[in-house]
Regions:
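Generic hydrophobic alpha-helical segments
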Residues: 8, 25-26
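A short, surface-exposed loop/turn module that caps and links secondary-structure elements
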Residues: 27-53
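PIN/NYN-family metal-dependent endoribonuclease catalytic core
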Residues: 1-3
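Enriched for short, Lys/Arg-rich terminal
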Residues: 6-19, 38, 51-59, 63-81
Length: 81
């Protein structure tokens, strides 16, 4: 999403380690599916998205669309706080 892309580009300026972690999480989603792999994946209640831990403070929220394309909703903060 545009929001997630903006957050990702912000991370590129702020913290390269976070960018590396986000990339690792995306690879895990691609390889392992929605709810398997690294980052403690979990479905979020009341929303049709899943979450993985980037850090204690930040989460990657995502899902697949009807064509099985990965959609990332956010990669900064904790469930869009």
């Amino acid at each position: 999403t545009p929001t997630a892309w903006q957050q990702y580009t912000d991370w590129q300026k702020e913290d390269k380690k976070i960018v590396k972690r986000i990339n690792e999480l995306i690879k895990s989603i691609d390889r392992d599916g929605l709810l398997e792999g690294i980052g403690k994946p979990e479905p979020l209640k009341y929303r049709k998205v899943c979450s993985r831990r980037i850090t204690d403070e930040h989460r990657l929220t995502y899902n697949f669309d009807s064509n099985q394309n990965l959609i990332i909703y956010s990669c900064k903060f904790h469930y869009e706080d």
